[in-house]
Amino acid sequence: MKRINIALAGLAVVVMFTGCKSLYGKYERPDVNTQGLYRDPVSLTDTLAVSDTTSFGNMPWRSVFTDPQLQSLIQTALDNNVNMLNAALNVKMVEEALKVARLAFLPSVAFTPQGTIAKFDDNPVTKSYQLPLSASWNVDLFGNLLNAKRSAQMQLLATQDYQTVVKTNLISGVANLYYTLLMLDRQIEIVGEMEGLTKETWEKMQVMKDTRIGYRSTAVQSAEAAYYSVQAQRIDLQRQVREMENSLSLLLGQPAQTIQRGTFEGQSLPQDLATGVGIQLLNNRADVHAAELTLAQCFYDVNQARSRFYPQITITGTGAFTNQNGLVNPGKMLWSAVGSLVQPIFQHGQIVAGLKVAKMQYEQAYNTWQNTILQAGNEVSNALVQYNSAAEKAEFDAKRVEVLKKNVEDTRTMMSQSANTSYLEVITAQSNLLNAEISQVTDDFNKMQAVVNLYQALGGGAK
């Protein structure tokens, strides 16, 4: 034991002069530039200014999506979605791996009882037994176990963040599909109204053909075709509704079914869409945070790879109760203690290659982290421009709808009062009005979708 103590003391001195800082160092965030991380397009309202310090992404999801039916759907998805369930299992698996890394600091203990019965010729039967209890302790003088534990801790935190990523993606996915259904419902209503209007126009033209001399049958045919076109458009929208319901049911972890929902006009989303400063994405976005934790994990993997160049020190002790003849008196205790030191000299290049690979994996993790930050900024920029463009376009579409409604009314009146009005003017006016009203609903939906996408891009949904 005295020799072991001397060896340990000598190695401790060696550690002091061989850069133990590189073996025990803790991860520190590298420099990252978040200036101009996302664009600040000229917004239509002051609520879109990105200079605010409070981020829209910090709001709880129930405060953002206040529709009770949507809240119920989101909660169902969080409880039943397969990806959410698997993400939770991944966290539990990594937790078990961390427990193993922590227990590695403790001695390993083994109990290996043995018994022997022997008989030679006419000699009496001899019975012997041995009840050994052995313990082996790896002295973590060079940080191998410490860095393995820290790496496992980072892996656990990163896995928990990925679970949050799944949650935020699921919330935004359910919300977008829900609002898509509401948009389609409203468009079906508009098409239904236009269906009645085009049918009425067709019937009027039929009467005019029968009562006016020289009224062409082509006008009636065009009006009839316009009516059928609107009917076909309604069927197409109904198909899209069924597809959206099927997709939403899949996110809910349920068979395809009819989705209970509110109305498009009854939706209310927050108007304060402050994005906060770019550095907040490093804390709010779970995927950005997870990417940095993966970088930290690789940092500790590099430390662990360096520690393999140093000796491995193991202390082993054994105690046994035995009656083996020739060793000790029957029923006595046997004790032994051994200290061993293994210094790698030639490992076929495995240790050197392991360190090089660990360093390259660290560089890859750093690049991935940087790219994740850029991608987050890109998503924020896209959501902002989507909201602004939809809001700006909605103003023009609203004016267009107002003008076209009057145009339809005027052309219908003129058609019934004068033969100078072409049937094409009536049909064209109705078609233009339908397209404008559909576009107006799409604009409102795009604003809703932009709010959902911005909320997700800012890390919303974690709370």
Question: Residue locations for each model-derived region?
Answer:
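Short segments within alpha-helical structural elements
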Residues: E195, K199, S229-Q257, K399-L458
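Terminal intrinsically disordered/low-complexity segments used for targeting and assembly
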Residues: K2-D79, Q238-N283, A457-K463
